């Protein structure tokens, strides 16, 4: 039997999907803009 592939880590989660990670790149800022336009309660992890 194979192991579960999702091994949660809040540090990795924030580093790859966090607000500051999104703000760091132009495309990340586009992601945030789209989510704001859609009216998301949470913009990032």
Curated annotation (Swiss-Prot):
<dbReference type="GO" id="GO:1990904">
    <property type="term" value="C:ribonucleoprotein complex"/>
</dbReference>
<dbReference type="Pfam" id="PF00468">
    <property type="entry name" value="Ribosomal_L34"/>
</dbReference>
<dbReference type="GO" id="GO:0003735">
    <property type="term" value="F:structural constituent of ribosome"/>
</dbReference>
<feature type="compositionally biased region" description="Polar residues">
    <location>
        <begin position="1"/>
        <end position="10"/>
    </location>
</feature>
<dbReference type="InterPro" id="IPR020939">
    <property type="entry name" value="Ribosomal_bL34_CS"/>
</dbReference>
<keyword id="KW-0689">Ribosomal protein</keyword>
<protein>
    <recommendedName>
        <fullName>Large ribosomal subunit protein bL34</fullName>
    </recommendedName>
</protein>
<dbReference type="GO" id="GO:0005840">
    <property type="term" value="C:ribosome"/>
</dbReference>
<keyword id="KW-0687">Ribonucleoprotein</keyword>
<feature type="region of interest" description="Disordered">
    <location>
        <begin position="1"/>
        <end position="45"/>
    </location>
</feature>
<dbReference type="InterPro" id="IPR000271">
    <property type="entry name" value="Ribosomal_bL34"/>
</dbReference>
<dbReference type="GO" id="GO:0006412">
    <property type="term" value="P:translation"/>
</dbReference>
<feature type="compositionally biased region" description="Basic residues">
    <location>
        <begin position="11"/>
        <end position="20"/>
    </location>
</feature>
<comment type="similarity">
    <text>Belongs to the bacterial ribosomal protein bL34 family.</text>
</comment>
<feature type="compositionally biased region" description="Basic residues">
    <location>
        <begin position="31"/>
        <end position="45"/>
    </location>
</feature>
